[in-house]
């Protein structure tokens, strides 16, 4: 047995890694702290220990799938009908029903299997990744491929992929509430080692990090010690396996109450009324309703025979019951939803929860972040202001990673506010600033040390890396886009991060590194810095800082950057008028700085402030230094303000068009961003969230459109609810602000979607009706909390998702209408058919049970699938969102169901009676509901005519419901020829076309094939009766067209009398009309914005 195998076996038994040092842990598990595992070894271990999963994400439960197909009300009607058929010895009907049940269950199983596989593959697309070191190089792999011995890197926003023995931590906190129930984050320390004699609980093992915990602060490196079900969370998952949650064991309730609750849960799960997506539950409830209606109709049949129930009456009752069951409905729904989820992948939307497919069509408010969603997320440094030094501008730069691109200029001494308000226009711009700086060709009254201090801070208060990829000869970067923009500028000025710290980049050649260092020795910032501590960016404080030791002058330096308000609150001084001495910051000084922040933000730039402080080794003792490096408040106090940077994040090219289309679709778009209010307002105007002519609106209206997070959070719930409209832009917003916004929308009965990418966005993503996470820049935690993931982080992809959600909802509505209208037609037809009595006084059913089943299962199923694949209607995104409370069962759908059903009933009844009394002699014979005899000739031929008519009407109905109101012959009014328009209508959906053709043709063989026709279907070949079938099918088509014409006239009249409900008129209105017409902005709510 190999050494690795021994260690793996020991690893399964050993649980005291918290008692080992990092070196001991690495030796025990067989890995290198610096190199990690080799690729071959990692593959061998993966094969030995299996994938790192809890075993329940992608496993297909075949038993549950079978039960799901069998245990529903629709199948139960078929099963009962089958049992009765066999009980009365109608072997043919019973056999056909058995076959239908088997086919239905088989098709359902296949489609559910495919749908499950599709959803599992989509889950894999959005599953968390892990960052590991293998062969000495950092790699990103799927979390399921992590094995014991991997060296794993984690940072803020990551979900820890496996149990880790930490070997390096930097201000590292994790959320272990999922494991321990402790709501507060837990601080970790890799240097701790616990005694072997001590009993240390899982929650107290502070040198370990546990699988599925979220990183809420800092970063760390650790050895993977346990994976999958061997991890701490895996042990819990293993103990919970097999608990369905259907049995109530509430100790506060009595045995009888628990039994009642459990019975309801089990029955609901059995019938599908309390499991699955909301739409599945609604349809399961519909199935239960139809079951009881079927029972009622069967009772009516028996009552009409005075409950003298013989074989024929029982079969007729079965026939009527079957007519009420759209048995193919669940199958078609499953196919439609799985296809919809697959289609969304091609449109950069990954569906994680099927519920979201239904919810997307009802969304009427979208709350979106700005950075990387509305904008490209590829940030470019545009302006830098260093007090007493001047303003640096960067132009002609479009590549966010290439430091060699662009022109750098200096406006000496002028601040952005000053040069933008300079009436002379001559601000003395100095071109080629970099060359002038290093050639010392700058005005004598400009102190280069000011720029050096700012540049050192910008470089070191930064963890992004910029490098030239030797393989592709292209510039690339790793890190946050904002930090990348700053690091690119530092690299442009020949002062990259590794030039100050001496760190070697694994992505650059040594030649490049040496070049940077050798060039840097004679330029600003030549000191060598050692990283001591880091306080990472936090959405609460909105800043980050790093502590470095300068080996050249033996000083400790704290460098910070962040939002202006956050940084300025930490500063007590800045460089005075001479630019040399540090002087206290006064309120007047802060207001001067604030003016420049406004000036930059009003140009759509994201503004960050920079500050620093330093002290010598003699100024602090060890305890004071430890306090500084561990206490954020101490480290980030009494800083010296150094300057500002304005970063431009250009809007995506598709954003403005997407916002316009959302407005056309009746969807409001809100921007909730952490950026400064001026930046947010400028970008919002650029993309159309705010009107471009905002200056035409009164200040009161502007204040209702734009707020800051503190202003919105400062309002009570009552004050928020009293606002006539909710703000379109909230700047400087926190995660809690997003939660309050969603709560406010929900109180207004709005159906909203929320985008998010950070750990702290999880509450708002969960609370929103549709949570949307970012696939590229989103954290693992936000993805897990979301319903859908945008694989390209693009706002326009949300439009794709909404459009696909509406298309799918539309199509579900169409095939539900088609199937239920057929059921109504068949049920009414058979109930009316009770009036036909044979020579023995028994009812003669005008359609046989097998004919009913054929129309429901064979004729209707494939056209219904075709309707599920129907393309989006041309006006799909010109309609308002559908009512989420009503769902697909609107009053229009309900009325249409009965209208089409009644028209179809009339056509079929006319065909039956026309054949029976017109073409034939009108004799109803005797015993014609079971076997054929000579007296049944007229009845059997008339059934054939009615069967053909019902079949063809059902197929024509599928074409008619492609559009709920528009005439089938005017589906494409933009076509230049009626003939072309007709063929475009029938050929546009080829699956539907061939399904209908198949249905039309299938009527002939079942009428003419011997034995099948008279023994199974209980009808006979016909001749002249085909004319009746064709005539009354056309009559149905005309009736359907007249009904739709009446609908169009009705809605036109409604629009004329209620122009405010006219959708076309609404689309032409100003989307900001609700704001401009608001007349009551409460004066007690101070929402003014100072600028």
Swiss-Prot record:
<dbReference type="Pfam" id="PF13246">
    <property type="entry name" value="Cation_ATPase"/>
</dbReference>
<feature type="transmembrane region" description="Helical">
    <location>
        <begin position="313"/>
        <end position="333"/>
    </location>
</feature>
<feature type="active site" description="4-aspartylphosphate intermediate">
    <location>
        <position position="369"/>
    </location>
</feature>
<feature type="binding site">
    <location>
        <position position="732"/>
    </location>
    <ligand>
        <name>ATP</name>
    </ligand>
</feature>
<feature type="topological domain" description="Cytoplasmic">
    <location>
        <begin position="112"/>
        <end position="282"/>
    </location>
</feature>
<keyword id="KW-0547">Nucleotide-binding</keyword>
<feature type="binding site">
    <location>
        <position position="561"/>
    </location>
    <ligand>
        <name>ATP</name>
    </ligand>
</feature>
<keyword id="KW-0479">Metal-binding</keyword>
<feature type="topological domain" description="Cytoplasmic">
    <location>
        <begin position="1"/>
        <end position="63"/>
    </location>
</feature>
<dbReference type="InterPro" id="IPR036412">
    <property type="entry name" value="HAD-like_sf"/>
</dbReference>
<dbReference type="GO" id="GO:0008554">
    <property type="term" value="F:P-type sodium transporter activity"/>
</dbReference>
<feature type="transmembrane region" description="Helical">
    <location>
        <begin position="886"/>
        <end position="906"/>
    </location>
</feature>
<comment type="function">
    <text>Catalyzes the hydrolysis of ATP coupled with the export of sodium and potassium from the cell. May export potassium less efficiently. May transport other cations such as lithium. Sodium/potassium efflux ATPases are involved in salt tolerance and maintaining the membrane potential across the plasma membrane in high salinity (Na+) or alkaline (K+) environments.</text>
</comment>
<feature type="topological domain" description="Cytoplasmic">
    <location>
        <begin position="870"/>
        <end position="885"/>
    </location>
</feature>
<feature type="topological domain" description="Cytoplasmic">
    <location>
        <begin position="334"/>
        <end position="815"/>
    </location>
</feature>
<feature type="binding site">
    <location>
        <position position="606"/>
    </location>
    <ligand>
        <name>ATP</name>
    </ligand>
</feature>
<dbReference type="Pfam" id="PF00689">
    <property type="entry name" value="Cation_ATPase_C"/>
</dbReference>
<feature type="transmembrane region" description="Helical">
    <location>
        <begin position="283"/>
        <end position="303"/>
    </location>
</feature>
<dbReference type="InterPro" id="IPR004014">
    <property type="entry name" value="ATPase_P-typ_cation-transptr_N"/>
</dbReference>
<feature type="binding site">
    <location>
        <position position="673"/>
    </location>
    <ligand>
        <name>ATP</name>
    </ligand>
</feature>
<dbReference type="Pfam" id="PF00690">
    <property type="entry name" value="Cation_ATPase_N"/>
</dbReference>
<feature type="transmembrane region" description="Helical">
    <location>
        <begin position="64"/>
        <end position="84"/>
    </location>
</feature>
<keyword id="KW-0630">Potassium</keyword>
<dbReference type="GO" id="GO:0016887">
    <property type="term" value="F:ATP hydrolysis activity"/>
</dbReference>
<dbReference type="Pfam" id="PF00702">
    <property type="entry name" value="Hydrolase"/>
</dbReference>
<feature type="topological domain" description="Cytoplasmic">
    <location>
        <begin position="1043"/>
        <end position="1091"/>
    </location>
</feature>
<dbReference type="InterPro" id="IPR044492">
    <property type="entry name" value="P_typ_ATPase_HD_dom"/>
</dbReference>
<dbReference type="InterPro" id="IPR006414">
    <property type="entry name" value="P-type_ATPase_IID"/>
</dbReference>
<keyword id="KW-0406">Ion transport</keyword>
<feature type="transmembrane region" description="Helical">
    <location>
        <begin position="91"/>
        <end position="111"/>
    </location>
</feature>
<feature type="transmembrane region" description="Helical">
    <location>
        <begin position="992"/>
        <end position="1012"/>
    </location>
</feature>
<dbReference type="InterPro" id="IPR006068">
    <property type="entry name" value="ATPase_P-typ_cation-transptr_C"/>
</dbReference>
<feature type="topological domain" description="Extracellular">
    <location>
        <begin position="907"/>
        <end position="943"/>
    </location>
</feature>
<feature type="topological domain" description="Extracellular">
    <location>
        <begin position="1013"/>
        <end position="1021"/>
    </location>
</feature>
<keyword id="KW-0067">ATP-binding</keyword>
<keyword id="KW-0739">Sodium transport</keyword>
<feature type="transmembrane region" description="Helical">
    <location>
        <begin position="1022"/>
        <end position="1042"/>
    </location>
</feature>
<dbReference type="GO" id="GO:0015662">
    <property type="term" value="F:P-type ion transporter activity"/>
</dbReference>
<feature type="topological domain" description="Extracellular">
    <location>
        <begin position="304"/>
        <end position="312"/>
    </location>
</feature>
<keyword id="KW-0812">Transmembrane</keyword>
<dbReference type="InterPro" id="IPR001757">
    <property type="entry name" value="P_typ_ATPase"/>
</dbReference>
<keyword id="KW-0915">Sodium</keyword>
